[in-house]
C-alpha cells in the first residue's frame, strides 16, 4: 500500500494505537469503543476515526472496535504484519542497549547483524550477535535478509555508516546519531533525538508554572 499522502503524525499515532491495543489484548479486552481507546491513547475519538479512515472502514457502529482485528488491520496498513530484518551499525553504549532490547523482535523488527569499525569490538558477541567489520556489510545483506539499517555511531561517523547501508542495498534507515545524513531520495530516513522529548516535558512544566 502506498502511503506517501498520509501525514507522518498519523503514522506515529497508529504506532501508539498498536501499542495500546496490544496491551488491551494482553489484559483480555476483546472489544473497545472509540471513546475508551481515545482516552487510552490520549487523543480524541474523532482523531482515531480520521486516522483509521486513511486505510479503510473499521469498527461496528454501536459496538466499537474488535481489538484483535484492529491490531491486525493496523499492522497490515503499516507494513508491520511481517518480520523486518535489521542491521545495526555502531556498537557503542546505545547500540548495545538496542541489541539487548527484546521488544524490537516482538514488534516485527529483528536485528540480525551488528557492525562496527573498531577492531577491539569486532568479534565480540553482544546479545547473541557477533560484531562484524563494516566492510563486510554488503556481503551480509542478502544472506541475512536485511532491509532496515540502524545507525548508532558517533555523529562524525554517521555519514560513513549511511554510505555502507545504502551501498549494501538497505531500503530504509533509523538514525540515532546526532547528525544529518545524505542518502538517495528513495531511502527513507527517520531521525531519533531523545532530547526532543525532554524539550517537550520542560516546556509543559514551564507553561504550568
UniProtKB/Swiss-Prot annotation:
User: Does the record's keyword annotation contain Transcription regulation?
Assistant: yes
Where in or outside the cell it occurs: the entry states: Cytoplasm
* Binding-site list for NAD(+): 90-95
DNA-binding region range list: 16-55
Tell me any Pfam family this protein matches: Put_DNA-bind_N
One GO MF term: DNA binding
Q: Which GO terms describe its cellular component?
A: cytoplasm
Q: Which domain of life is it from?
A: Bacteria
Q: SUPFAM superfamilies this protein is in?
A: NAD(P)-binding Rossmann-fold domains (SSF51735), Winged helix' DNA-binding domain (SSF46785)
Give the matching SMART domains.
Answer: CoA_binding (SM00881)
GO BP, sorted A to Z:
negative regulation of DNA-templated transcription; response to redox state
Q: List the disulfide bonds.
A: none
Identify the keywords attached in UniProt to this record, alphabetized. Cytoplasm, DNA-binding, NAD, Repressor, Transcription, Transcription regulation
Matching PANTHER family, A to Z? REDOX-SENSING TRANSCRIPTIONAL REPRESSOR REX (PTHR35786), REDOX-SENSING TRANSCRIPTIONAL REPRESSOR REX 1 (PTHR35786:SF1)
Q: What does this protein do?
A: Modulates transcription in response to changes in cellular NADH/NAD(+) redox state.
- Family per similarity comment: Belongs to the transcriptional regulatory Rex family.
**Quaternary arrangement and interactors, per the entry?**
Homodimer.
- What NCBIfam families does the record tag this protein with? PRK05472.1-3 (NF003989), PRK05472.2-2 (NF003993), PRK05472.2-3 (NF003994), PRK05472.2-4 (NF003995), PRK05472.2-5 (NF003996)
Name of the protein in its database record: Redox-sensing transcriptional repressor Rex
Organism classification, top ranks? Bacteria, Pseudomonadati, Thermodesulfobacteriota, Desulfovibrionia, Desulfovibrionales
Q: What's the name of its gene?
A: rex
Amino acid at each position: 500500500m502506498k502511503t506517501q499522502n498520509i501525514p507522518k503524525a498519523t503514522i506515529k499515532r497508529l504506532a501508539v494505537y498498536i501499542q495500546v491495543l496490544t496491551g488491551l489484548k494482553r489484559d483480555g479486552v476483546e472489544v473497545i469503543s472509540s471513546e475508551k481507546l481515545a482516552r487510552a491513547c490520549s487523543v480524541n475519538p474523532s482523531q482515531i476515526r480520521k486516522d483509521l479512515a486513511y486505510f479503510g472502514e473499521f469498527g461496528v457502529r454501536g459496538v466499537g472496535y474488535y481489538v484483535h482485528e484492529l491490531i491486525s488491520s493496523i499492522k497490515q496498513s503499516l507494513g508491520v504484519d511481517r518480520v523486518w530484518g535489521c542491521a545495526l551499525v555502531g556498537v557503542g553504549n546505545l547500540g548495545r542497549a538496542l541489541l539487548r532490547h527484546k521488544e524490537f523482535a516482538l514488534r516485527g523488527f529483528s536485528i540480525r547483524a551488528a557492525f562496527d569499525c573498531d577492531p577491539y569490538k569486532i568479534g565480540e558477541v553482544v546479545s547473541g550477535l557477533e560484531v562484524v567489520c563494516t566492510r563486510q556489510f554488503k556481503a551480509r545483506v542478502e544472506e541475512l535478509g536485511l532491509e532496515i539499517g540502524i545507525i548508532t555511531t558517533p555523529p562524525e561517523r554517521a555519514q560513513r555508516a549511511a554510505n555502507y547501508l545504502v551501498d549494501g542495498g538497505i531500503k530504509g534507515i533509523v538514525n540515532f546519531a546526532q547528525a544529518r545524513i545524505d542518502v538517495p531520495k528513495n531511502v527513507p530516513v527517520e531521525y531519533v533525538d531523545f532530547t526532543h522529548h525532554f524539550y517537550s516535558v520542560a516546556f509543559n512544566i514551564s507553561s504550568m508554572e
